[in-house]
């Protein structure tokens, strides 16, 4: 218990002193993760006015907030999560598991035959503390997201996903390269240095 308590105190200290936490509070974003997407988009311009995108594992909603601002009224943002999410202007939210037929049917109805330009995914499992198990569960979610992207993205579309480097990383990269013309890595400044998280950006879906 002492180790857990010490770790929790260290996390709380880091959180309180985190510039991105303060920026998120000031700018009205629900989580510091908003700045990761903003930085990636500044470089890669994957979201612009008119973009039609799906945000998988969207709660609490910071990526959907960013996406709604960047797509504007001419675009569309569809957010999906099994967890509840407070409403965001310009975002269509579906609560449910995106593997399930009824959820997919809702999504396809809202999409209304529009081409899907982009899928973004910042999902991570609830961590158990078992590194091997957590890594496996993380890549399972990533595989589900890749499957969704491969089925729903238009030809030429893009896919941005958070992964954790370690077991399964190279295999996942290889799977993405089979689906996308290019796959690039991104490590935004807003990612904590100690984190093994990295973002993979697949462009030009085959």
From Swiss-Prot:
Pfam family, one: FtsJ
Active-site residue numbers: 162
Keyword Acetylation attached: no
Name the UniProt record assigns to this protein: Ribosomal RNA large subunit methyltransferase E
Primary localization: cytoplasm
Catalytic activity: uridine(2552) in 23S rRNA + S-adenosyl-L-methionine = 2'-O-methyluridine(2552) in 23S rRNA + S-adenosyl-L-homocysteine + H(+)
Molecular function (Gene Ontology), one example: rRNA (uridine-2'-O-)-methyltransferase activity
InterPro entries: RNA_methyltr_RlmE, RNA_MeTrfase_FtsJ_dom, rRNA-MeTfrase_E, SAM-dependent_MTases_sf
Entry GO terms, CC: cytoplasm
Subcellular location: Cytoplasm
Record family assignment: Belongs to the class I-like SAM-binding methyltransferase superfamily. RNA methyltransferase RlmE family.
Keyword line: Cytoplasm, Methyltransferase, rRNA processing, S-adenosyl-L-methionine, Transferase
Residues bound to S-adenosyl-L-methionine: 61, 63, 81, 97, 122
Main enzyme class: transferase
Origin species: Neisseria gonorrhoeae (strain ATCC 700825 / FA 1090)
EC number(s) given by UniProt: 2.1.1.166
Function of the molecule: Specifically methylates the uridine in position 2552 of 23S rRNA at the 2'-O position of the ribose in the fully assembled 50S ribosomal subunit.
């Amino acid at each position: 218990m002492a180790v857990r308590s010490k770790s929790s105190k260290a996390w709380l200290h880091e959180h309180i002193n985190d510039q991105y936490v303060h920026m998120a509070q000031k700018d009205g974003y629900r989580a510091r993760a908003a700045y990761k997407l903003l930085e990636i988009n500044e470089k890669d311009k994957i979201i612009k006015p008119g973009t039609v995108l799906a945000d998988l594992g969207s709660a609490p909603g910071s990526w959907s907030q960013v996406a709604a601002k960047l797509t504007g009224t001419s675009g569309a943002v569809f957010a999906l999560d099994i967890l509840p999410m407070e409403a965001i202007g310009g975002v269509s939210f579906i609560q449910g598991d995106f593997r399930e037929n009824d959820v997919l049917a809702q999504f396809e109805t809202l999409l209304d035959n529009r081409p899907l330009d982009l899928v973004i995914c910042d999902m991570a499992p609830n961590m158990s503390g078992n590194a091997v198990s957590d890594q496996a569960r993380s890549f399972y979610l990533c595989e589900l997201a890749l499957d969704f992207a491969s089925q729903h993205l238009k030809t030429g579309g893009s896919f941005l996903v958070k992964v954790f480097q370690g077991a399964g990383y190279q295999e996942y990269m290889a799977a993405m390269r089979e689906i996308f013309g290019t796959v690039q890595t991104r490590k935004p400044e807003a990612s904590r240095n100690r984190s093994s998280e990295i973002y993979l950006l697949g462009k030009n879906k085959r």
